[in-house]
Curated annotation (Swiss-Prot):
Function: Associates with the EF-Tu.GDP complex and induces the exchange of GDP to GTP. It remains bound to the aminoacyl-tRNA.EF-Tu.GTP complex up to the GTP hydrolysis stage on the ribosome.
CDD domains per record: UBA_EF-Ts (cd14275)
UniProt name for this protein: Elongation factor Ts
Gene designation: tsf
Record organism: Rhizobium leguminosarum bv. trifolii (strain WSM2304)
Location of this chain's protein in the cell: Cytoplasm
One Gene Ontology MF term: translation elongation factor activity
Length: 308
């Protein structure tokens, strides 16, 4: 078993909101495995699945761009928010997003593509910007969606400039109907995705490993009731149905009209569109998601702790 350090306990507390002794016990029970410790705490009812770390995420901007029946969302990181508010950096991210639409490819494809304003590759243009602005930056993610018929709607939450912000969403809608009406429902669905962060479009598309992990947690929680195995199985099945409803886009309650599911809202929109609509794809990029940088600002750390 790996040594349980104070740093590990601190990280688990930040991720779950559980008490120090509970975190220490969870790590000891799971051999120091952080993800297993989170599940252990959840099974005991001590932590919630969606508690997020309070550590500082990478700065930068999310950019979206669209062209005809395709669109892209990119993430470009910087070291500080100050640079993210710099006009030159914003122009760079906006330009990279436009290049990404034309390449319709991965980060590597976008990085190798020519940046029109410089005549150099996007990668070399970023290097030039680093030298000029004096801060490290990188193209971290690029996701493109396209349809043969229909639209790919885009949405930036709390935009800091045209097509730029901290959270960007794409949603691809297949339809031969009216494009203006299709864009209207597409934007609403994109706003919904920004708010709820669904894991998949349909329940059956939820990652099997994620579903299995949830089932195991529910089993452990249900066993604490002391009920027979056949009752526990029914309890777990019921909780799994609710889980799929909560994390799959089409079965979620529509944030704009909670009386409808997203599927029902899209179906209702078909009247204005004049043709069937299929939700064919989605992408949601939150700035700095999954990336943490070293904390060196003691004052900021204290302020974050005070805010809870």
């Amino acid at each position: 078993m790996s040594e349980i350090t104070a740093a590990m306990v601190k990280e688990l507390r930040e991720k779950t909101g559980a008490g120090m002794m509970d975190c220490k016990k969870a790590l000891a029970e799971t051999g120091g495995d952080m993800e297993a410790a989170i599940d252990w705490l959840r099974a005991k009812g001590i932590a919630k699945a969606d508690k997020k770390s309070g550590r500082t995420a990478a700065e930068g901007l999310i950019g979206v761009s669209s062209q005809g029946t395709k669109a892209v969302v990119v993430e470009v990181n910087s070291e500080t928010d100050f640079v993210a508010r710099n006009d030159a950096f914003q122009d760079l991210v906006r330009g990279i997003a436009k290049v990404a639409v034309s390449t319709n490819g991965s980060v590597d494809a976008v990085a190798a593509a020519t940046y029109p304003a410089s005549g150099k590759s996007v990668s070399d243009t970023i290097k030039d910007a680093i030298a000029t602005i004096g801060e490290n930056m990188n193209l971290r993610r690029s996701v493109a969606l396209s349809v043969e018929d229909g639209v790919v709607a885009t949405y930036i939450h709390n935009a800091v400039s045209d097509g730029l912000g901290k959270l960007g969403v794409l949603v691809a809608l297949k339809s031969t109907g009216d494009k203006e009406a299709l864009n209207a429902i597409g934007r609403q669905v994109a706003m919904h995705i920004a708010a709820t962060a669904p894991l998949a479009i349909r329940p059956e598309e939820v990652d099997a490993a994620v579903a299995e992990r949830e089932r195991n947690v529910f089993i452990e929680q249900s066993r604490a009731s002391g009920k027979p195995d056949n009752i526990i199985e029914k309890m777990v099945d019921g909780r799994m149905r609710k889980f799929f409803e909560e994390v799959a886009l089409l079965s979620q309650a529509f944030v704009i009209n909670p009386d409808l599911t997203v599927a029902a809202a899209v179906k209702e929109a078909e009247k204005a569109v004049g043709a069937p609509i299929e939700v064919a794809g989605m992408a949601r990029l939150l700035l700095g998601e999954g990336v943490e940088k070293e904390e060196t600002d003691f004052a900021a750390e204290v302020a974050a702790a005070v805010k809870g």
